[in-house]
């Protein structure tokens, strides 16, 4: 709630104006029945036409003024609510963007989408309702009750009875419906999760012909949400017939008992008509308040869910007193006794990691699945922070650098090439907005993307569809590599980034990349020995520990784990050739 109040404080002037127009509108509505009473008592019954014309004209003018006030109130309420929603949505997006990878684990992707769309929409709708009704209803109820008692005090018990019945019904609905609102938002999360999984895994679903199973899962989630929606909506719909019954019975009772009072000379016809109008205003006011009280708990669930995200502080932030990299920074990376454990995990993924990656050299990492290769290089751009030890960049602990300064030094290419909606050029210069067209083209050429780009109708201005769906996996990966090159960093990180390339393209790319990065620090994660065997240093990981460091020839001689990997990937002829080469090198 504190976030809502903080954002709302920026609209206090609009709110004050809205309060003024709301008060004016309610006063206009409360003034009309009295004038109607005067027309009946002093005009119609006494056949005083000037009184009829005078009061009738006044009623028309006041009605027009009230209508104008209502329009202004609607405009201001919408402006405040939509402005708050926009601000809230922006803050939520910025907070999520600042999260470290560990922070994302606290919320599912589907839940974050629901919170930034459905929940904020719920807050916006309730805000409009509150601004329009929460102010108007109490004033109308109190003013209407005073006016009603003034016109016919003997009939005021009818209003008390009608309001009591309404309050009992509303309380019952409140108790039943409110617990369902939280469940409703959870079911929306569940449906979004199933939908997202189906969209992301569509190829796998079709490949294994599991469409019916996924349809069943979706239908189950959809049915649960539908049942809950129906239950809540039916409860809300009960208010309408109950309201109609209460108003109709109240009207009948007022006319019935009012007629007896009129016949006995204790009440005038105009006063009874005014009382009837005021009674309806009071009853409607309580109905409006009940709608507010029912909607607020539902919105409160959304406020809490949005607040949970905004209250989650990023676990990785800039240091209070950041250090500067040396002016002649070269990109030297040092791991000193680094240990890392994932949040909520019992055992470390990496233990006592020590190595140095020198500028002008290529350092490669290899190991079995789950050995910690990708985790290790994800520590360098601070996707996660080390649990113990230090990672130094040119002698400075990366935790003491501003994140922006750290990212400027790194060109990162993930396992799966990621492209964004826009042009090919905008994707290549994504990490370097100041990149010239010449640099964009040079980066594409090094990444072996220039050839296929030149064949496109619009070249570098060709549009990339969402997720890069209109380019192949290899093209997507080459553009991702070009994006890293365009940053012109001191440190290049390739997380198994050549897997989608054919042998010929891979060889050309590595040759061009070697020339471009001859004075840079290059870190490569590989699954296949033939992709990393020419590296200056190969680090072998097994169960989160370094079990070997050296060149390919050295590891083939001394590292048992590396030998096992080689034996599983290479033919006997290749192994014999490598053994001969190793023996020759040793001699």
Predicted regions and their residues:
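Membrane-integrated ABC transporters
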Residues: 1-32, 36, 44-60, 65, ...
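Transmembrane helices of ABC transporter permease
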Residues: 10, 14-27, 38, 62, ...
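Internal alpha-helical transmembrane segments of multi-pass membrane proteins, especially GPCRs
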Residues: 16, 20, 53-57, 61, ...
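Short intracellular "coupling" helices and adjacent cytoplasmic loop segments at the cytosolic face
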Residues: 46-47, 82, 90-114, 118-120, ...
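Helix-loop-helix
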Residues: 48, 143, 147-164, 175, ...
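An intracellular "coupling" helix at the cytosolic face of ABC transporter transmembrane type-1 domains
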Residues: 98-102, 118-131, 135, 139, ...
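ABC-type nucleotide-binding domain
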Residues: 326-587
């Amino acid at each position: 709630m504190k976030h809502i109040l903080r954002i709302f404080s920026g609209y206090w002037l609009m709110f004050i104006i809205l309060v003024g127009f709301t008060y004016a509108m309610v006063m206009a509505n409360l003034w009309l029945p009295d004038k109607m009473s005067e027309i009946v008592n002093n005009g119609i019954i006494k056949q005083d036409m000037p009184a009829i014309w005078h009061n009738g004209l006044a009623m028309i003018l006041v009605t027009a003024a009230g209508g104008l006030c209502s329009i202004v109130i609607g405009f201001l309420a919408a402006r405040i609510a939509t402005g708050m929603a926009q601000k809230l949505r922006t803050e939520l997006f910025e907070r999520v963007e600042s999260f470290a990878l560990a922070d994302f684990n606290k919320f599912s992707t589907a839940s974050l989408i629901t919170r930034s769309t459905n929940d904020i929409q719920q807050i916006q709708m309730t805000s409009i309702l509150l601004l329009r009704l929460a102010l108007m209803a109490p004033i109308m109820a109190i003013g209407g009750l005073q006016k009603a008692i003034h016109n016919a005090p003997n009939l005021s018990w009818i209003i008390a009875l009608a309001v009591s019945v309404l309050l009992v019904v509303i309380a019952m609905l409140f108790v039943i419906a409110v617990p369902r609102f939280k469940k409703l938002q959870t079911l929306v999360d569940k449906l979004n999760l199933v939908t997202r999984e189906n969209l992301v895994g569509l190829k796998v679903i079709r490949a294994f012909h599991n469409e019916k199973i996924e349809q069943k899962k979706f239908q189950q989630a959809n049915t649960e949400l539908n049942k809950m929606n129906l239950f809540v909506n039916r409860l809300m719909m009960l208010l309408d017939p109950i309201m109609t019954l209460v108003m109709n019975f109240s009207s009948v009772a007022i006319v019935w008992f009012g007629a007896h009072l009129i016949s006995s000379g204790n009440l005038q016809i105009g006063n009874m008509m005014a009382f009837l109008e005021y009674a309806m205003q009071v009853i409607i006011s309580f109905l409006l308040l009940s709608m507010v009280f029912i909607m607020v708990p539902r919105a409160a669930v959304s406020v809490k869910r949005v607040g949970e995200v905004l209250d989650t502080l990023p676990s990785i932030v800039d240091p209070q007193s950041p250090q500067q990299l040396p002016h002649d920074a070269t990109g030297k990376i040092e791991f000193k006794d680094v240990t890392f454990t994932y949040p909520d995990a019992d055992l470390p993924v990496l233990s006592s990691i020590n190595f140095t990656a020198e500028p002008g050299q290529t350092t490669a990492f290899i190991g079995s699945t789950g050995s910690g290769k990708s985790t290790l290089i994800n520590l360098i751009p601070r996707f996660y922070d080390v649990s113990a030890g230090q990672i130094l960049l040119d002698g400075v602990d990366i935790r003491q650098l501003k994140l922006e300064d750290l990212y400027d030094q790194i060109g990162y290419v993930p396992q799966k090439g990621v492209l964004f909606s826009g042009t090919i050029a905008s994707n290549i210069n994504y990490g370097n907005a100041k990149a010239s067209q010449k640099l964009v083209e040079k980066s594409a050429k090094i990444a072996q993307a220039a050839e296929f780009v030149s064949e496109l109708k619009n070249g570098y201005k060709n549009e990339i569809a969402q997720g890069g769906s209109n380019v192949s996996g290899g093209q997507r990966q080459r553009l991702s590599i070009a994006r890293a090159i365009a940053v012109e960093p001191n440190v290049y990180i390739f997380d198994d980034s050549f897997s989608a390339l054919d042998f010929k393209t891979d060889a050309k790319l590595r040759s061009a990349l070697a020339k471009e990065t001859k004075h840079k620090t290059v870190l490569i994660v590989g699954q296949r020995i033939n992709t990393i065997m020419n590296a200056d240093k190969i680090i072998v990981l097994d169960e989160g520990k370094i079990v070997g460091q050296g060149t390919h020839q050295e590891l083939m001689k001394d590292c048992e784990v590396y030998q096992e990997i080689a034996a599983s990937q290479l033919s006997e002829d290749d192994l014999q050739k490598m053994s001969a080469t190793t023996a020759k090198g040793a001699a």
